[in-house]
């Protein structure tokens, strides 16, 4: 299987090859597979998507450090394209994305960068844990502001 996969990587000339490694029975892989299947038609001119069971490609497991539940990697003309997601690991996405548009945007960025000869591209969105924490904190502040506004409106209505 590993040889067949490498052959496929070398024969695809015009599109990015997106490979989700893992196990079909893994819940994280199932989530990622749903996202990938739902966007496959939208990205068909930019990318071809494969899912690969890591037990069938043991030689690639150590080569690409496929130890996470659901690593997704990108290749263009048999060259590994890295993506800076803000996580510190530029080799692969090692979690299941929850947003279809995020995956489409990443594939588009990889496609455009790879066609220009870049081996590393910057993700259009920051996925760093620090960013996620700040985003949650901001949402809490916004909720508090909304509650205050609602209280003021209720008081005005009550007084009138």
UniProtKB/Swiss-Prot annotation:
Biased composition (Basic residues): 133-160
UniProt-listed GO biological process terms: mRNA splicing, via spliceosome
Region entry Disordered, spans: 132-160
Pfam families per record: DIM1
GO cellular component: nucleus; spliceosomal complex; U4/U6 x U5 tri-snRNP complex; U5 snRNP
UniProt keyword list: mRNA processing, mRNA splicing, Nucleus, Spliceosome
SMART domains documented for this protein: DIM1 (SM01410)
Gene3D superfamilies: Glutaredoxin
SUPFAM superfamilies attached to this UniProt entry: Thioredoxin-like
Subcellular location, record wording: Nucleus
Top-level taxon: Eukaryota
Family annotation (InterPro entries): Dim1 (IPR004123), Thioredoxin-like_sf (IPR036249)
Functional description taken from the UniProt entry: Plays a role in pre-mRNA splicing as component of the U5 snRNP and U4/U6-U5 tri-snRNP complexes that are involved in spliceosome assembly, and as component of the precatalytic spliceosome (spliceosome B complex).
Subunit structure: Component of the precatalytic spliceosome (spliceosome B complex). Component of the U5 snRNP complex. Component of the U4/U6-U5 tri-snRNP complex.
Protein name: Thioredoxin-like protein 4A homolog
Species per Swiss-Prot/TrEMBL record: Dictyostelium discoideum
